[in-house]
């Protein structure tokens, strides 16, 4: 379970950063 969270959390942050970049552009 923890391994899944460790893989899931970075992907969520990546998605949020991508959304922020799209808004800036």
From Swiss-Prot:
GO biological process: defense response to bacterium; killing of cells of another organism
One annotated GO molecular function: toxin activity
Compartments in which it is found: Secreted
Keywords assigned by UniProt, alphabetized: Antibiotic, Antimicrobial, Cytolysis, Hemolysis, Secreted, Toxin
Major localisation: secreted
Tissues with expression: Expressed by the skin glands.
Highest rank taxon of the organism: Eukaryota
GO CC annotations, alphabetized: extracellular region
Subunit structure: Exists as aggregates of 3-4 molecules.
Similarity section: Belongs to the grammistin family. Group 1 subfamily.
Role of this protein: Thanks to its abundant amphiphilic alpha-helices, it may integrate into membrane phospholipids, leading to lysis of the membrane. Its hemolytic activity is inhibited by phospholipids, but not by cholesterol. Has antibacterial activity with a broad spectrum against various species of bacteria including both Gram-positive and Gram-negative groups. Also has ichthyotoxic activity.
Protein known as: Grammistin Gs F
Taxonomic path: Eukaryota, Metazoa, Chordata, Craniata, Vertebrata
